[in-house]
Each structure stands twice: as structure tokens, then as C-alpha cells.
Amino acid sequence: MMFCYQCEQTTRSPAGIGCTSEPGTCGKDEATAGLQDILTHLMKGIAQYARRARAMGVADRRTDDFIFYGLFTTLTNVNFTATRFVHLIQEASKRRERIKLLYEEAAREQGKTPEILSGPALFQPADSLEQLLRQAPSVAINADVEHLGSDVIGARALILYGMKGVAAYAQHARVLGYQSDEVDAQAEEILDYLASNPTDLDEMLEESLEVGRLNLKVMELLDVANTDSFGAQEITSVRISPIQGKAILVSGHDLHDLKQILEQTKDQGINVYTHGEMLPANAYPLLKAYPHLAGNLGGAWQDQQREFADFPGPIVMTSNCIIEPGRSYKNRIFTLGPVGWPGVRHIDNGDFTPVIQAAKALPGFTADAKEQRITIGFGHHTLLGVADKIVDAVKHGDIRHFFLVGGCDGVSPARNYFTEVADNAPADSVVMTLGCGKYRFNKHEFGDIGGIPRLLDIGQCNDAHSAIRVAGALAEAFNCGVNDLPLSIMLSWFEQKATAIHLSLLALGIKGIKLGPTLPAYLTPTLVQKLQSRFDLDLDLIGEAQADLQTALAHTA
């Protein structure tokens, strides 16, 4: 029987929590869920040897490349193709043996006896799909829950799911050529810790903060990678309605993939549009320099079945979030990198000729739509450049409060909370936003305060790094801590990248975070109590938008 409870929309019923029958709420079948568990288990085994090899002076970058890529494939709404996971499992087994040999050779060369490891280091995956599925329950996240209890399993899950989010951001940086030995070493250490099957709750919560600290380093690395590769985000008016012509829609998060598509479609008479979390690409100078980057269409991931069906061209998924393609567009959607869906064409060689051919064969937009625009590009480079103006506005009473409202979106009606907060924030407040949660209000009119826009789109979910930088700069300007600022954080979560970001905020000691719309299923009442007492968390948001606004506004500089 499958078991998965890593996303916000996991099944919750009187019978229990977690998706235990196929398909899960994300569309994942039992085979894929089981294979993902095996692959994750093997990643821990690889890390066991990689950490020890590194201690012997042997750091193997290809091994760490595979760890991050492999974990990324197991995120919610990334890869649903069981056959791909069979291949990845086979590859993981080979890579584990390779790093094991490197470790043992290095130990012997230094006159030391190699450790005899256990757990994931020794797990031998079966050769066939049928046999692999028989093995899967033994390595599932909830294996031995009857003996260990749900608190221990939940604390382990918090660490693991945070690491999956870290892996996604690290992979985006690595495809741009940015890697850090410090990051790789810490990732190996955390996965090795999980491989030891820890049971101490307080120790595991401390380790989860290590995941948060690691994610801070990775988000900073990705910010440098994006800025060095494409320039710093600029304030940009981006079109959100189509223009006449052939068209390609690019969704996901990977700016490197978008750059390749833009380069290969130059002078082809094809317009390229972004979708979802790819919206901030339109603010990067070296990407918006392509004249056929025509703007952004659509909204958050959960609306893609309707939006993709209406789009008159091919769609390219560069990362999560993919959901089951509708019949009307399944033959014109493509996946890249870690993404996969059964029966959908996958491009793994960087050649987008099939996408270009599809764009030319499909009708495209037959006329310009009425022009509509929104303003984006308020990353930390932009905001820190006008920090003095913002500080003066606060000192003169023009800006009373800051709200950070964003994160992952989803289908729950309870997520209207975030719309209510943003729309009802008073006229002397500024709303910063990021991630796909912004689509709930980023087309609304917010106006400005003395030329400072009241709605500041900071970027993708990983641009939480920018929000942290800005908050730190404001705290320094006012000679106070971040928790003393007139700043309220309302974080919407859906999948594992949001888990990593949340852990990063906790690692920074930021208190009073509003998290929702529901509690992560793996956080048991015991774990919630420990987190609430230490971090002053408020984990129940439903129906409290107006009350939370009043409470927030009582906290002023």
C-alpha cells in the first residue's frame, strides 16, 4: 500500500492522514510512490559513503550532482513516470558502489580500516519493477511507525522534505554552473544523519534547523547564479495578454531552460511566454533582451489544465508543478530535466527542435488581445537601491507596516486568506510577495506610497533570499532585530521547497510566522507544541485574515 504525506493537499480523513491509495491527490500512482521511496533511500546510502569519502579528502562532484537531481525528481508534481524511476534506482545503485570504492580506497591509502556501514548503504534494489515494488514498503517514510510512533516519523519527514526543497534549488544553481563544496558537504551530513534512523525528537528538530541554514546558503548561491547569468532583476512592466503569432509557453522555475528555448527560437517567428513561477524571468536583463519573450500568461500551477488547454501552441514544463495533462494538449506538452509524465514527450538533450516544429504547426494567437500589464522585478538589488527612500517613508509615518504574503499556491478555498490579507492591508502598508501565491492578488490595484509601489513582486519562491536581505537591511537601518520590525509574514505552503524556506526562517530566529492554509500532515501535535513554544508559530489561519491584520498592525516600529 502506498503512503505519502509530503504535500499540503495530502488526504486527511477520520481514517487517518496521508495518501494511501492510488492515485494520490497529486495524481501519483502506487508504483511511482514506492519507487520514489526507494530512490530516496538510496540517496541516503550514497551520502553515507560520500560523507566518509570527503573526510578522507575525496569529494566527488558527480556524486553530489546525482544526489540533488535524484531528490528533486521526488518532489511533489515533478515526475510521475515509473520507468524513469526504475532507471534512476539502477543508476543510484551504481553510483553508490562507485563512491563506496572511492571511500574504501582512500581509507586504505591512509592506513585506516573502512567502516562497515548499515542501513541504506547496504540496501540492494531488485532488478525488476515487480520486485522493487515488493521492497518499497520496507523503506517508506512511515516504515516501522507502529514501533517508532508518528512523532519520530514526522520529525524525520520534516528533515527529509526540507532536504528535497534544498535539492531543487541546488539543482537550479548547478545547471547554471554554480556549486559549493560547503553545500555539498552539509547535504551529505544531513542525509547521513537521516540514514542513522534518529529517534530523539529535540535532536531532530535541531537538525531540521540545519536544513534551514543549508537552504539559506543554497538560495544565496542560486541568487548569485541567476544574477551572474542573467543580470540583476529590474523593475519591469510585463505584458500578461497575448499578441498575434506562433507561441510557446514555458512553465516551471528553470531560467537556464528558458534561456535555451529563447536562443533556439530566435528569428523563427515564434513568441515565447512564461507561465507560473517563470514570471520573474521577464525582469532579468539578459532574458528580456530577447524581443520574442512576449510576456507572461496564466497564473499558478493548479489552473494549468484549463490554461494549457486554451493555449494555441506547445507547452514546456521545466520543473514542478506538472499535473495530469488533459487530452486536448497532452500531445503538445513537453517535459525537461527531472520532470516526467507517462506518455508525454521528454527532451533530455537540450534540442528543442520538436517544440519549435510543434509551435510552427499549431495556430498560435490569431490576433492581439487587449493589452494588460503588471509590474515585477523588485528583487533585493532593486529594493536595497532605494532603501533610504523606504526608511524615510517609515520614519515620516508614510509607511506603517510591511507584509510578506506569498509562497506556494494550491486549490484549497482556505487560501483566500492570503488574498484577503493583501487586499485589505491598509493604504499606509506595503505588501511584498513571491512564489506562485502572488497570483491570487498580483493583478489587483494597490497604488503607491510616495512613488514606492505598495505591491512589490520579489520573484520566485527561492527569492525568499531577497526578502530576507531586505528585512535584514531594514533592521540594520532601524537598529533593531528583524522580529522588532513592523513586518508580518504570511507564508502559504504546498510542497517541499516551502518546507525548506520555512525552516530557513526558523533558523534565522524569525518569530510569529503565519503558516497555512493547513498544518503539514507530518507535524504531529507533539511536534507542533515543540515548534510553537520555541518559535511562536501560528499554524491555524482559516477565517482569521481580518483578525490577523489587526494584530499585525498593532505591531509598529
From Swiss-Prot:
Q: Which UniProt keywords apply?
A: 4Fe-4S, Cytoplasm, Iron, Iron-sulfur, Metal-binding, Oxidoreductase
Q: Which cofactor does it need?
A: [4Fe-4S] cluster; hybrid [4Fe-2O-2S] cluster
Kindly give the InterPro entries that the UniProt entry links to this protein: HCP/CODH, Hydroxylam_reduct, Prismane-like_a/b-sand, Prismane-like_sf, Prismane_a-bundle
Q: Which GO terms describe its biological process?
A: response to hydrogen peroxide
Residue numbers bearing the Cysteine persulfide modification: 408
- UniProt family annotation: Belongs to the HCP family.
Name this polypeptide is given = Hydroxylamine reductase
Source organism of the structure:
Acidithiobacillus ferrooxidans (strain ATCC 53993 / BNL-5-31) (Leptospirillum ferrooxidans (ATCC 53993))
